[in-house]
Regions:
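Extended, charged interaction scaffolds in large complex subunits
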Residues: 1-113
Length: 113
């Protein structure tokens, strides 16, 4: 269960490109995230975006398995290009968010002792 809703399913390569670009703008700090969850924000947002990216990837792989898809197909190029890079960005942001939480918990433990 995610803390905020996202689009679901597949659309055109251009619409998926626009969706992913919006998420990239959030992760890069160009626009505000959809939630403000303190130190957990980066982790929660990147985890949600990663889940959406993997959903898109799964749907695209199902499409390729069920139909003959040419190598020049726009959705296939999206999956092997932008989507793959976005998944890596989400994983990096998720790791950074996890480290921020760890540091915050360590600081809290030091204050309590």
């Amino acid at each position: 269960m995610q803390k905020f809703p996202l689009k679901k399913g597949l659309s055109s390569a251009q619409e998926l490109h626009d969706e992913i670009n919006n998420y990239i703008d959030v992760l890069m700090g160009h626009i505000n995230p959809p939630i403000a969850d303190g130190v957990d924000t980066l982790f929660e947002v990147s985890s949600t975006y990663l889940a959406r990216a993997k959903e898109i990837e799964i749907k695209l792989l199902e499409r390729e398995r069920n139909a003959k898809v040419e190598s020049g197909d726009e959705l296939k190029k999206f999956r092997t290009g932008e989507l793959r890079s976005f998944i890596e960005l989400c994983k990096s942001a998720q790791n950074q968010g996890s480290r921020r939480i760890t540091v915050a918990l360590s600081e809290l433990n030091l204050k309590e002792n």
